[in-house]
Amino acid sequence: MKKITIVSSKKYIRSSQFKSLIETLDSKKIVYQYIDLDKTEEDFEINSDSIILGLGGDGTALRAMKLGWINKAPVLNIGSGRVGYLVNSLEDIDLTSLLSKTNQKHLKPRTPIIQNQETNSPAFNEIVIIKNSPTRLLDLEIHTYEQKVKLRADGIIISTSLGSTAYNYSAGGPIVQTSMNTLIITPISPFTKFPRSIVLDKESSIKIKVAKNQNYSIQFDGIESISRISNEDEYYEYLLSEDNLDVFYEKDIPKLDLFLNQILR
């Protein structure tokens, strides 16, 4: 039986779901430790022999996935009911069976986007380049397939298939089946003419040029952000990593019923 590292925040500690989870782990004599996401200054030892168990919503799931990526440990995300797109319902899974061994049929590879070959800041949903000034557009240039397109917009989203129902969709992008493993380029409030989105194959590389004198931020899954002021043209390359993160899923099907119920309210 592997050691469990529970990743959550204070508001979930008080939930009945957290209590039920702890009771299950205690009854099976499963060794576990707890990481409080509200206390990011603490150092925790996580190794590849652990299973990271994220308890919460999609934000918690993404943070758990980043921890899993950095520590090369598989991840199981659990949320309340069917609220989240990235989480399993505790009622729908056999937790003991999943955690007793690494059952290959329940492991699904998730491939993040990486920036400039930097693997410590993976993005499993999307990377966003967005303006910091409310009144000034960004001047961007997109390079892919040995072609380039200029774009003036509030920003740009580079999304995975997994993240296609997140910010990508809010900005008018398409929903893509997660198993397709694509890259999606979607502009944010474009001023110049630009397709609503461009869907690229998994082997594609995207280079973005941000013109000089731009005030902008780069956001990774909404949980990490870097602010920049460009004194000269700046270039960023985005591609899908050659490595994957193993994530436990009881049912690897898109939650279209959940998604459509949300947007048709």
What function would you assign to each model-found segment?
Residues 150-194:
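Gly/Ser/Thr-rich active-site loops/lids in small-molecule metabolic enzymes
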Residues 16, 63-65, 86-88, 139, ...:
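Short glycine-/acidic-enriched loop or helix-start segments at secondary-structure transitions
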Residues 57-60, 81, 162-165:
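Short glycine-rich anion-binding loops that position phosphate/pyrophosphate groups of nucleotides
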Residues 81-155:
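Catalytic core of DAGKc-family lipid kinases
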